[in-house]
Amino acid sequence: MPRYNHRTLAQMRPIRITRHYIRHAEGSVLIEYGETKVICTASVIEKVPPFLKGAGQGWLTAEYGMLPRSTGERMQREAAKGKQSGRTMEIQRLIGRALRSVLDLKKLGERTIQIDCDVIQADGGTRTASITGAFVALCDAVGYLRAEKIISENPIKDHVAAVSVGILKGQPLLDLDYAEDSSCDTDLNVVMTGNLGLVEVQGTAEKVVFSRQELDVMLDMAQQGLQELFDLQRKTLETAAS
């Protein structure tokens, strides 16, 4: 089945990561998955939540949001509504879990890294782009802490990234854009570490159930895409640091 954007079934959209995008943040990137664009920042806060006071470890938490005109029709700001949607809370918890999976909180010391992911243009895959970009922002925030001799050891244990896969008209597809995501039979978000450990697999049969064999095919396809993302993360971090 040809994809309307001329990609092959197992081909990612063009991915770009621009570091140091926000001047004031200890770590920041603009990440682009095709036409999806997300600003990710990592801010160092010299305190921990009350439940961790005196525990000798740090914390990482995340917030996620979409600009009103990041979509085809203007959305009302959640701040104007007075509460966050269930979707927003689900996504920001996912981002936090994903990044904590590769972070040694004891080496971070009693401080918090606050991740903020703001979608400025949405075309599918905003949560996966947020995780992949936020990891690079986290690396820069940790780099700041080490350069300032606030911490001595690197608390980051591995890379982490995320990608979507799905089944549309019986065909598995990698890295769904909005048109594909809104019409697919199955939608899967896969979060994985650089050593190929699974952090999270979110899968839903939208219209037609999927088989165990199809799940394995989608996971293999996701792993292929994630390898590309890990390579890009490494190159981005190395290039800007040299």
UniProtKB/Swiss-Prot annotation:
MF GO annotations:
3'-5'-RNA exonuclease activity; tRNA binding; tRNA nucleotidyltransferase activity
The GO annotation for biological process reads:
rRNA catabolic process; rRNA processing; tRNA processing
Q: Which domain of life is it from?
A: Bacteria
Sites where the protein binds phosphate: R87, G125, T126, R127
Which InterPro entries does the entry link to? ExoRNase_PH_dom1, ExoRNase_PH_dom2, ExoRNase_PH_dom2_sf, PNPase/RNase_PH_dom_sf, Ribosomal_Su5_D2-typ_SF, RNase_PH, RNase_PH_bac-type, RNase_PH_CS
E.C. designation(s): 2.7.7.56
Q: Which family does it belong to?
A: Belongs to the RNase PH family.
Instruction: Give the multimer and partner information.
Output: Homohexameric ring arranged as a trimer of dimers.
Protein purpose: Phosphorolytic 3'-5' exoribonuclease that plays an important role in tRNA 3'-end maturation. Removes nucleotide residues following the 3'-CCA terminus of tRNAs; can also add nucleotides to the ends of RNA molecules by using nucleoside diphosphates as substrates, but this may not be physiologically important. Probably plays a role in initiation of 16S rRNA degradation (leading to ribosome degradation) during starvation.
Kindly provide the name given to this protein in its UniProt entry.
Ribonuclease PH
Q: Which organism is it from?
A: Nitrosomonas eutropha (strain DSM 101675 / C91 / Nm57)
Q: Which gene encodes it?
A: rph
